[in-house]
Amino acid sequence: MSQFTNVAITKEANIYFDGNVTSRSVHFADGTKKTLGIMLPGDYEFNTGAKELMEILSGDLEIQLVGEEWRKISAGESFEVPANSSFKLKIYKITDYCCSFLG
């Protein structure tokens, strides 16, 4: 799905890592939430509360989930992160993403 309809968007950005990772929250009528964001090249570590689905819309990166090896992710691919966990990212070029909160 490349477009969302009937949503509310929080105007204030979510800003992480001195502005190198930013996103906007999109709220759906059914109570679910997604964030749409951009990550600049760099190394980052995130913690999760809810289970997440990360869809990579454009970019080039590697991800490491807890207890797993690094793996390459490209535009058009996605990965899931368990609830109450963490993951590491190596961003090699500007990356556009959509994060869905599943829990």
From Swiss-Prot:
It catalyses: a purine D-ribonucleoside + phosphate = a purine nucleobase + alpha-D-ribose 1-phosphate; adenosine + phosphate = alpha-D-ribose 1-phosphate + adenine; cytidine + phosphate = cytosine + alpha-D-ribose 1-phosphate; guanosine + phosphate = alpha-D-ribose 1-phosphate + guanine. Its EC number is 2.4.2.1, 2.4.2.2. Keywords: Glycosyltransferase, Transferase. The keyword Transferase applies. It holds the Pfam family Ppnp. GO terms for molecular function: guanosine phosphorylase activity; purine-nucleoside phosphorylase activity; thymidine phosphorylase activity; uridine phosphorylase activity. GO terms for cellular component: cytosol. Catalyzes the phosphorolysis of diverse nucleosides, yielding D-ribose 1-phosphate and the respective free bases. Can use uridine, adenosine, guanosine, cytidine, thymidine, inosine and xanthosine as substrates. Also catalyzes the reverse reactions. Belongs to the nucleoside phosphorylase PpnP family. This is Pyrimidine/purine nucleoside phosphorylase.
